[in-house]
Regions:
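Short linear sequence motif anchored by a di-proline
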Residues: 1-219
């Protein structure tokens, strides 16, 4: 399960040749945070600020996003939370610099980062939803996941056992195909990312100390 990641940077955005993102977003994202989503509209590729975690039309409590940030590709059609989006082929991508997973060392979880070796951003497959709650338009999205028990890198993460999951990475040369896909059958996209193009390393959270008035971090 991926619950934490860093969105792409401005330099990575420019390297991909994508249009400017017209809103601000956090350097690091967790469930129920806002994040940038790329999708295809009738006008072409567009950015939207969405909630990380699917908020279906029937949900009364927006905090459901804390539980719906990942969606198993195997059960998308069976889960009420994701049915509407998969049936209407609301496919998007979440461009990221790196994402984080828990690796258990001596039965204790450590935070590890996964990223491309070449430093480029990459696209994580997503489903999105748009619904109205009162006078508010709510936009949200979830990362689609796959079984990773046979993936050389991703099988090392998560709690010990036989359940291993991974996000689905959409190759750069299949981006347009994914965003324009018109079928609920997405099996042709369910593939583990090429291990030789990625790397991972221990990435402990940095504790932010209380800022002293005497310190100037811009010097």
């Amino acid at each position: 399960m991926c619950a934490n990641f860093k969105p792409l940077t401005l330099a990575q955005l420019e390297a991909l040749g994508l249009t400017e993102i017209p809103f601000e977003y956090s350097d690091e994202v967790y469930p129920n945070y806002e994040m940038p989503l790329l999708f295809r509209s009738q006008q072409g590729l567009e950015w939207r600020k969405v909630c990380f975690g699917m908020i279906p039309k029937w949900a009364d409590d927006l905090s459901i996003a804390l539980k719906t940030y990942n969606a198993r590709n195997e059960t998308l059609m069976q889960k009420p939370t994701f049915q509407n989006s998969i049936q209407k082929c609301k496919f998007g991508v979440i461009p990221v610099s790196e994402f984080y997973e828990s690796k258990y060392i001596d039965n204790k979880p450590q935070r590890w980062s996964v990223r491309r070796k070449d430093g480029k951003a990459f696209y994580i497959a997503a489903l999105y939803e748009i619904c109205q709650k009162g006078e508010d338009i709510i936009r949200s999205a979830t990362m689609i996941t796959m079984d990773a028990i046979g993936h050389a890198m991703m099988k090392e993460f998560h709690e010990p056992g036989n359940v291993k999951r991974s996000v689905i990475v959409i190759p750069h040369d299949r981006l347009e195909q994914w965003l324009s896909w018109k079928s609920s059958n997405i099996q042709s996209f369910v593939d583990g990312f090429p291990v030789e193009e990625f790397e991972c390393s221990f990435a402990p959270k940095i504790k932010i100390e209380k800022i002293s008035p005497q310190l100037n971090f811009f010097d």
